[in-house]
Amino acid sequence: MTLSGRTALITGGGGPLGRAFALALADAGARVILVGRGEQALADASDRVAKEGGEARTAVCDVSDPDSVTRLAAQLADEDVSLLVNNAGVAGPVRPLVDVEPGEWDDVFAVNVRGVYLMCRAFLPPMIAAGRGDVVNVASVSGKRPLLNRTPYTASKMALLGLTRTLAGEVGPRGVVVNSLSPGPVRGPRMDRNFRLTAELTGCTVEAAERDFASRAALGRLVEEDEVARALVAMLAMPGLCGADIDLSAGMIAPA
């Protein structure tokens, strides 16, 4: 598939998965704009894309802050962004719900749900006016299979699936396609943190926590960043896909 001539905006662009998305989309021909809160992380990701022969600009933005998103939209007003990848997300606490502080709950929803709403609100109008565009929201398999001791995160991803389906119905008739991608546990720094916190909570070893997560998948393993990125590109090559969610979890499906 070619994305030549299209501009893709990726939130959470300084993280490992954002970087993988950038590499895959640039390889498909897209111009990439990486958005995130960490300037150095964004610069490192942009350099990686450039080394692979792609093009990636960066812009600092806090997607949970309406003013920051408004400034970003004004900054990129002439960029003709036709692909929005809402990848920014926070993992939140690893504790039973009764031990979660209200501020921790709010922090998770501020990025994982409110951030997606704010980005869509800012960048959908030009797509609607042009009669074309794609939005891919990065959800999680935990939005379909509850993850114990991760209630804020699980609830936020369930909310994101609902947002995706509803928004697809609103803007699909205007030529804009909205879908979501639900990875399982992706190998990398975020899951390493989750394994450590799970081990501390349950009293097991970090290695045992990782084995437990992997055992929940039919393939018995975690998902790799490049697998998720390739799935994103594949989704964009399916013109009939709208209001859908693609599960990329190595078979970590919801129990019957």
Model-derived regions: residue spans:
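Active-site helix of classical SDR
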Residues: 120, 156, 164
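Short C-terminal tail/terminal secondary-structure segment
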Residues: 94, 145, 237-256
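Alpha-helical segment proximal to the catalytic Tyr-Lys
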Residues: 125, 169-170
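Conserved glycine-rich cofactor-binding loop
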Residues: 7, 14-15
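Residue(s) in the substrate-gating loop at a strand-loop-helix junction
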Residues: 140
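Substrate-binding pocket helix/loop in short-chain dehydrogenase/reductase
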Residues: 81, 95-97, 104-109, 213
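C-terminal substrate-recognition "lid" of short-chain dehydrogenase/reductases
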Residues: 117, 221-248
